[in-house]
Amino acid sequence: VGGSEFSRKVRREYSRIQPQTDQQLREMTANYYGMISLIDHNVGRILQALQTYGLDEDTLVIFSTDHGDFMGDHGLYLKGPMHYEGLLRVGLLMKGPGVPLDKVVNSPVSTLDLCPTFLDYAGGESEPDLHGTSLRHLLEDPTADRDFALNEWDLLPGRAGVKLDLRVVRTQTHKLTLELESGEGEMYDLKNDPHELHNLFHEPAQRAVRNELTDMIRSRPDDMRPVGTPVGAA
């Protein structure tokens, strides 16, 4: 729905995986690992260049990504509007002035926190409408903690067959995905069900947990400026 005929053609022919043989799936997986090795090699080149030019002790380096890949989890490949750990839980490594060595942060954080973190370490002032929070206090204060991190994804029918307004909250023990229009969702106890196989969303005994997580989702200001056509225009 929507978009040009060309964009619809691209969506139909190139954005969905056609049925694959086991051998083809193995090759896809091998290609993914190959791309990881390529990234690792070239990040190493960047770090070596910083060292060569004497900038490594005065540069904040953050290595992360926008999302993961299902890689067969839940019978899925690539990415999609299913917020399982393989897609959302990505690496985040930091090195630079003031960043403690061997520090591990177990609190849930978000890529929304990166911009405030850059500003904090650079001595700049954070904008008042930024939703993220600097990660510096989590790195430098051993008593600091974060209760939850948020994620959202809005899709038009052309991407998933139906319009979806998805909101996600991740704590250290639970995850809730809520679809705003229908009120449906998925909720997992990550401590006891790390592979997210047992949806607790409609379990009466879990209602209090679901309500608490829903309140966390609704605590985020709904003030995002329109950034263009949502994902799935084709």
Q: Which stretches of residues belong to each language-model region?
A:
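Residue-level signal for well-ordered alpha-helical positions
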Residues: 74, 200-203
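C-terminal helix-rich "cap/oligomerization" subdomain common to oxidoreductases
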Residues: 213, 217-228
